[in-house]
């Protein structure tokens, strides 16, 4: 089966594993998934991730993060720009997610960054996803 939207698949796997409180999950590796994983780790939404090299494309193992009473750190994930309908924003139109409580992941010419970093660098780009 051909995967038409690997980013949506990645976010869905995280959402599903989070809903059933799995400790970790594995996804096929790609550069953009590594960049998204790095942002999620840096912003405190996941505990860690590791890239496992194999003879093919590799695997990313994501370790999910939960609170003291096993409450979820990730409340929601939403794919914004889709293959059939891309969503681009200018530097002055970068969205805020839940008035700053969440993050927007944006693919810019400077790489994949959060909404806050995009505003600081005055860079627009493709809005990949919202995480809150």
From Swiss-Prot:
GO BP terms in the entry: translation
Gene Ontology cellular-component terms listed: ribonucleoprotein complex; ribosome
Record keywords, A-Z: Ribonucleoprotein, Ribosomal protein, RNA-binding, rRNA-binding
GO MF terms, alphabetically ordered: rRNA binding; structural constituent of ribosome
Ranges that cross the membrane: none
PANTHER family: 40S RIBOSOMAL PROTEIN S15A
Job description of the protein: One of the primary rRNA binding proteins, it binds directly to 16S rRNA central domain where it helps coordinate assembly of the platform of the 30S subunit.
Family: Belongs to the universal ribosomal protein uS8 family.
Quaternary structure, from the entry: Part of the 30S ribosomal subunit. Contacts proteins S5 and S12.
Name listed for the protein in its UniProt record: Small ribosomal subunit protein uS8
Organism field: Latilactobacillus sakei subsp. sakei (strain 23K)
């Amino acid at each position: 089966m051909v995967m038409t939207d690997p980013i949506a698949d990645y976010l869905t796997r995280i959402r599903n594993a989070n809903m059933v409180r799995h400790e970790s999950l594995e996804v096929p590796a790609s550069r953009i998934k590594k960049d998204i994983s790095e942002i999620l780790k840096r912003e405190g939404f996941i505990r860690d991730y590791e890239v496992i090299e194999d003879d093919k494309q590799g695997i990313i193992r994501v370790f999910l993060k939960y609170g003291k009473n096993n409450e979820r750190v990730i409340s929601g994930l939403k794919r914004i720009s889709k293959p059939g309908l891309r969503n681009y924003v200018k530097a002055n139109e970068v969205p805020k997610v839940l008035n700053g409580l969440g993050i927007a992941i944006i693919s810019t010419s400077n790489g994949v960054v959060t909404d806050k970093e995009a505003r600081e660098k005055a860079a627009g780009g493709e809005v990949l996803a919202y995480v809150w």
